[in-house]
Amino acid sequence: LNKMTSNAKEAVEDSDVIFLTLPAQHHKTVFNFLSDYLSQGQTVVATTGYWAGFRLIDLIKEKGLDKKITFIEANIFPYLSGKIGPAKAHIFNYKRFMPVSAFPSENNEEKCKIVREIYPEYKVFKHVLETNLYPGNPSVHAQIALPAAEFIFEKAREFKFYSEVTHTASKLADAFDEERIKVASYFDCDTTDHLTSAERMYEY
């Protein structure tokens, strides 16, 4: 670890690749804050992407960065982690298969090669439409949380999000998956079902 800092300018200057590792609702705020310090040739990676390229493209152009930086989306965060105590987290597992693409995709060959040097587990997909329509958090998170929301948030001292999934949540996830696969197929995107995707990611 070379440096830890809360100074945005100091964090991004002289960096080849900048990772946005934060919830999607904060992508725009943080990118806007960093934008004044970004320089020619830098690569910004949103992980997890959640359509970040489409959501941020107007801001990228407004800041005059569309010809200056490369924006890349990763389908999912590299680590399966959780809080285990005050100011303490633990990485329980990591992904072995993570779709990634530049936005626009014409930069895929050159720029995705750079991020694959950092995470060889990144697999370059055709474009960000394909990465976003591949299984990931949207395939299961809401489907697991909604049927058990009261239990998770009001009653449970501890809830193992994936291993304690309910039958109702499984049915919702499968139904969502059927719709997602249809949409992906319509746009000629390479995809698979969410269970096969989980096997690829974690090699269970």
Regions found by a protein language model. Name each.
Residues 1-14, 55:
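Conserved N-terminal Rossmann-fold NAD(P) cofactor-binding segment
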Residues 8, 48, 75, 104, ...:
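Residues at the C-termini of beta-strands that transition into short coil/loop
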Residues 16-19:
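N-terminal Rossmann-like NAD(P) cofactor-binding module of classical short-chain dehydrogenase/reductase
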Residues 24-85:
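Rossmann-like NAD(P)(H) cofactor-binding subdomain of soluble oxidoreductases
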Residues 78-176:
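Substrate/ligand-engaging "lid" and interaction regions
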Residues 177-204:
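Small-residue-rich helix-loop
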